[in-house]
Amino acid sequence: MVRDEDLDNLIKNLPFLIRQNINQHPSKQKLIEIVIDLGRRPEARFTTGPEYLSQKVISWQDINHFTKRISKFSNDNRAGIERTLHRISCIRNRQFLINGLTCRIGRAIFGTISSVRDLLESQQSILLLGKPGVGKTTIIREIARVLSDEMEKRVVIVDTSNEIAGDSDIPHSAIGRARRMQVATTDLQHQIMIEAVENHMPQVIVIDEIGTELEALAARTIAEKGVQLVGTTHGNCLENLIKNPPLSDLIGGIQSVTLSDDEAKRRGTQKSIIERKAYPAFQIAIEINTENSWTIHEDIKSSIDLLLRKSFTGTQVRELFLDKRTFIKYKKLQIDTFTLLKDSNSLKIQTINRSNNWFTRSQKSLFYFQNSKAKKCFIFIYSLPSNLISEILNKLKFQYVLTKELQKSSLIVGSKVSLNQNFKLKKLAQQCSIPVYSVNKENIYQIISLVKLFK
């Protein structure tokens, strides 16, 4: 990874005592932000922890010295330094006078997205989730550069606070060939998003910090027009978006549905349930846990549906090491049994993620996979002729072992009617995280199509 920090352009504008101490500090390159509050000692926050920069407290003169050397603060109390990525935010008193400053270091880090480059090449819309300060803006800046320079796409950035491309009319070189549209006030971000699509023919729209209902609706409108979206929002995981009413439209929105008595009994749930309302604006979600560890949801639609049914989703965790190796770890997949009790046509979509089934995980790949100890598939057959299934599996040269112990099985195969009636089997399958496959009839053609799904 290559870093471009422009730290000197920020430090030279600070008061003398702060400037001197930072320049002499051994952890200068690990600086995250500088906090300047009236009547308090200046504080520097590093990746290793906070430290005071001076024994002297900050005065009005120190604050005025700094604010005169930066750009004017906008309506969201943010400012910057010309041709840099640093952000300065202010705190005001009741008379609207500045009595506190937060100087956040902006860094262009090249090579941060090498572990998810395959997701960018899929041309699907990507949503990045993370806590404040985890590095979402740095990542989205690098995504814009890779899409515009290396993949040669028409990229337009909607830069609300001038954080992505810097505080200048000339965009920072870190965004490559991507174009940047500035926003006069934060209230107009959703209008600029629509304007970018209508006026500038982009293939990709990059948006930082989607935070209001209007912006979420604008994102959905852009997605319906066939433009690839790359956006960020605050939140630890997808569940936070479900519980956040203004942002739930990003993942399709949620609604309360009342089921009939028969349907509720078939599903084994209560009559009033929560379901996804529409298609999500984004197809892929990336949860940024730490700087080098990200959780990937390759199909947001399926993940949201399973979360609403209180089931675990099949996700992957990607870790990037210093030697540029990517380690991919698949989490265990646990799905409610009723979602699997579909006919064999819809089963291909409803059940297991293609990259999470046991067969794929047992193959050799460019990456490292966990949960791949079993080289043979242990099949538990319920209310179907085992001789017929064995014959089909042998003809298809499928490595398998028929087992009568449910807890040792890799998957369960049975008839739809019998599985619907056996609630105990459903519960055990859910507790043991065992996927369930079903067929409507004991038909050789249905069983063959079902077995082909295992591959």
UniProtKB/Swiss-Prot annotation:
InterPro entries: AAA+_ATPase, P-loop_NTPase, Spore_III_AA_AAA+_ATPase. Its main location: plastid. Coiled coil: none annotated. GO terms for cellular component: chloroplast. Pfam families: Spore_III_AA. ATP binds at G130, K131, P132, G133, V134, G135, K136, T137. Keywords: ATP-binding, Chloroplast, Nucleotide-binding, Plastid. GO terms for molecular function: ATP binding; ATP hydrolysis activity. It is found in: Plastid, Chloroplast. It comes from the Eukaryota. SMART domains: AAA. The keyword Cell inner membrane does not apply. Belongs to the ycf45 family. This is Uncharacterized protein ycf45.
